Amino acid sequence: MDSNVNSQRQRADSGYHRPVLLEQTLEALQIRPDGVYLDGTAGGGGHSYAIASRLRGGRLIALDQDPDAIRAAGERLAGLPATVVQSNFTHMDGVLQQLGIAAVDGILLDIGVSSHQLDAPERGFSYHYDAPLDMRMSQSGTTAADLVATLSEQQLADIFRRYGEEKFARPIARSIVRQRDKQSIQTTLQLAELVSQSVPAAARRDGHPARRVFQALRIAVNGELDCLSAALDTAFDCLKPGGRLAIITFHSLEDAMVKERFAQWRQGCICPREFPVCVCGRTPAAHPVLKKPATATPEELRDNPRSRSAKLRCVEKCHDRYRD
């Protein structure tokens, strides 16, 4: 392992969370010392620190909607050529405009909840701790407890099925509605135990039975898939020609969305097959940097089990995307 990357990993790991696929991400983005880069999901600054450390005359813009993450990132990036801004990555174009930056050389989005958020009981993301059922990344707006208390059985089942791919969505939703008529569901352990009681015993042997339900509620509370869909085109538009967009996902719904959008940008001619020559004149707006998604090495899997489901995809912009 490169000693520079190793030292960056050690610094990036300290005190907040361990950035996943760090080496693969840096290699995919091909950081130029004088380049301008944007980390749309700074978290505690793990990836951001590694990027900013490579800049000489360049600049990093680090965004996150979580005020806790912004404080941690600000401390970690102090003294480096980095600007830290509290904002959802869907607004990256507006942030860049306010900073007087027309386009950037590379963008990183590390989608999903951070290890710090999972490990902070009071944030209510984890079924391992007894805490308020919150799950808000921005610490404002509707909580998971609000959804559990107000949505109908059908609405809850739809969320569990769509965002968690939970095959026992209906019985779980039914149990929630019945339970809340007796007592409000306010904590993570209340919900986790209720889910566990709602699925067959065989389903409890394949990981924690509440995992998919918690994932689904988190996605719904934060509008994660809607945000990602909107951010993909915005991010591509913010790149210079030759700029690169790297995205790390942690579950199949996110990865499928990224894969599909990348494929759209890579599509060239759209003429019917029976046409002998191209008349549309379209050429690919992007080309793949990685032939297949990068995943964690055995070493990283040993050191950081949470990297198991991480996938990195990256494309390079050739020209502006087609908008029809």
Name every feature range the model reports, one short phrase each:
Residues M1-D324:
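S-adenosyl-L-methionine-dependent methyltransferase catalytic core, i.e., the SAM/SAH-binding region
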